[in-house]
Amino acid sequence: MVHLTHVPRPPLAQFVNLLWLYEGYTQQHAKERVLPTGEMQIVINLQEDRSWIYDREDTDRCQSFRGALVSGAHSQYQVISTAEQASIIGVHFRPGGAFPFLRMPAGELRDVSVSLDALWGRGAGELRDRLLEAESHQTRFEILERVLLDELARGCGRHAAAGFALRQFMAAPHMTTIASVSEQIGLSPKRFIQVFRDETGFTPKVFCRIRRFQQALERMEGRKSVQWAQVALDCGYFDQAHFIHDFRAFSGINPSTYLVHQTLHRNHVPLVG
């Protein structure tokens, strides 16, 4: 299996965490959960011009998209097929970083995925064609980076308040309050929530819950046993029961089940339970 990443240069780096590519991705399990991170991605299937997201309640049902799709601001896990990930390339945005590339408020992509051509028109298909014609993986990264730079140049500017709030929430998601942030930036709580939702896809409260969930996953990564009460305390949960409730809300499984079935990819878990 080939797994490559590419960190873009400024000014793209402040919006995009990294570009990634998989070739020959195979797993024993047929489907897996993709857990919410508070971030958006562009995913381009290079194997065929089609992508699928499966229904959480009935995994025999699915939504079909063109080969290039935008995975929006998800607060619940998604179900994907591992067989369809054999040759893919993607863009992993920073929290709020996708906004200038969407041509719409990020809140309109809350808990949905859409074909990239719904946002970029025929440019999405042209991008996929260019990636398929590229002679090397590095060339693919360079093509993707140039297209993103072009989109950034024509995209909407970001509100300074959203960037400030994201820095506060990323540093201490369990300690920073909406009231304290809105007071510091000079916006009413209602206006602040709207600005934050437009740029990240989430309300501040939901975003902070997802970040706490991600902090918990970091503490669980690679471990065979965990003191759940300590994880709950370290991540700012009121108690262990609140931690387990949030974990199930975002992942659909208990923390103990996740621990047994975790993979090398923290946010990808075999579909069980």
Where do the PLM segments sit?
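DNA major-groove recognition helix of helix-turn-helix
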Residues: 196, 208, 246-248, 259
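Alpha-helical bundle regulatory/interaction domains
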Residues: 1-189, 199-203, 218-222, 227-238, ...
